[in-house]
Amino acid sequence: MPRLLVAASGTGGHLFPALSVADALLEPWSVRWVGVPDRLETSLVPGRYPLTTVKAGGLQGRGLRKLIQLIQLLAASGSIRRLIQRERIDAVFTTGGYIAAPAILAARWCGIPVVLHESNAIPGRVTRLLGRFCTRVAVGLEAAAPRIQGCRAVVTGTPVRAAFLQQQSLPTWVPQGSGPLLVVIGGSQGALGLNRMTRELFPSLLSSGCRIVHLTGSNDPDVGCIEHPLLVERPFSDEIPALLQHADLAISRAGAGSLSELAVSGTPTVLVPFPQAADRHQDANAVCAAAVAAAVIVHQHDPSETTLRDTVWRLLGSKLPGGDPGANPLPEMGQAMRELGVEDADQKLVTLLEGLLN
């Protein structure tokens, strides 16, 4: 019975792809999980897979702080090494987060295969530093492969939750009407800037019959400042697969997880990269979609500027009163977005893992 240790921690962008791969593994595979205390995995993983938590952190500091972080890294690697030996783990799969570095080092220490999945177009710090110690580095976007040095990169795509691959019904709480549906996904990171940009569009769109669902993220002080029967604001939603499948247009950040979900849903999108993202990786992710005409990039700007408004009206105009139905770019954008997606990314990663043990 092959035993896999999944090392994934922190955000949904790390956890959901790892969960998709773990769920795709069939008997006789046995899966265990290692994560970090007080992170998202402590609520998502238990009940599905046995979870062990190990204290781990980043390596962003200097001087004494960095020395302490290095000591924590070695201690975490030792803890994971003991877990690997105790549970007789055969391979490690990691999607990043604070737990990735000690898991890679522990796997190397134990002499077992380790696969790292990098979902962004610009490899993250762990991939750049430790990718050479991995048996394989799987990448979600083809643009990342040439940027990975010292190891063999394999393009697999980024796995998404199963709900994105199944046809979903539009939630009943979505505004009803004949106008187009715009879905705005603020996200939990850097949502305020995007939210303020998009709210400047709402009055004119709503008065033209456009239906809007705005997922604001938490702690948005401006929620409720616009009230209209065609507008619904929510902090989050578990029904994003249905929203994206039925949306005529989305406005979203350009995180790798979000881009993968938009792609398999075939949703035409205006991408607004988070300007403070590490290494500006969201800009690079957005370029991958824009290069195939699946998305339009609008950089975050002051709400008083008109770039986002002009872009959205150009894309949705054919579906609004007075627009030219023959000048509708959305179908071609949706098709290009769907071609960017990889629906069987989880199976590609399963095949990769199985091949390393056979």
From Swiss-Prot:
Annotated EC: 2.4.1.227
The organism's place on the tree of life at top rank: Bacteria
Disulfide bonds: none
Enzyme class: transferase
UniProt keywords, alphabetically: Cell cycle, Cell division, Cell inner membrane, Cell membrane, Cell shape, Cell wall biogenesis/degradation, Glycosyltransferase, Membrane, Peptidoglycan synthesis, Transferase
Described purpose of this protein according to its UniProt entry: Cell wall formation. Catalyzes the transfer of a GlcNAc subunit on undecaprenyl-pyrophosphoryl-MurNAc-pentapeptide (lipid intermediate I) to form undecaprenyl-pyrophosphoryl-MurNAc-(pentapeptide)GlcNAc (lipid intermediate II).
Protein name, per record: UDP-N-acetylglucosamine--N-acetylmuramyl-(pentapeptide) pyrophosphoryl-undecaprenol N-acetylglucosamine transferase
Organism: Synechococcus sp. (strain CC9311)
Recorded name of the encoding gene: murG
